[in-house]
Amino acid sequence: MRNRFDRQLLELNNELIQMGSLIEQAIEMGISALVKQDVEKAEQAIKFDVEVDEQEKTIEALCMKLLLQQQPVAKDLRLISAALKMITDMERIGDHAADISEMTILMADSDYEKSAINMEVIKEMAKETTDMVIKSVDAFVNKDLELARWVINRDDVVDDLFDSFRKELIQKINENVKNGEMATDMLMVAKYFERIGDHATNIAEWVIYSITGKHEDELILRKLFPYRHKKGMLKDS
């Protein structure tokens, strides 16, 4: 019975890796389409969202099967519950990747070069967030606590990139009002990448829960207020 359960857990890991791969392709194709203003490629990138949604349903069904048929012990139950939470965030990442490609289509006639918008920051955000998504899934599959925490800490880098990009755009709008609409659209693109980073962080936090039984926020509270926890003021969940 346990061997069968372990095989199904391995299948779950493989399905999560496949979902992560679909998201990676959607983001990479989306940023390529954005930079090159390639509408056809953007339309292809949007199609990944359908595959991501289907993969979410596949994983959800597998998790329910594991819960109903295998009667998992506490540790396994945490792992399956975390996977169910993770795929919700992964599906939202797929949505945001599609949103970025839709913005590319919307801005098809815009002149990036004339607007002097710094596309390097956008490309860096795409690289960072893609890395976060892939590593968060790897952390789950390999039960790698340190890698999950690396992903969480990396979110600050994405936030800093977004803040600097936003300030730069505001300055450009003030200098040239004509570029205001395009700057606003590009800010939305940056915001979508920032949200992808947030969802990758959520995934990493669920990885930590699956390993430790504690959510990252609770672990932080325990470090900050060890006395309160010893006195029973912070309860185990």
Model-derived features: where do they sit?
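Cytosolic, long alpha-helical scaffolding segments
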Residues: 1-237
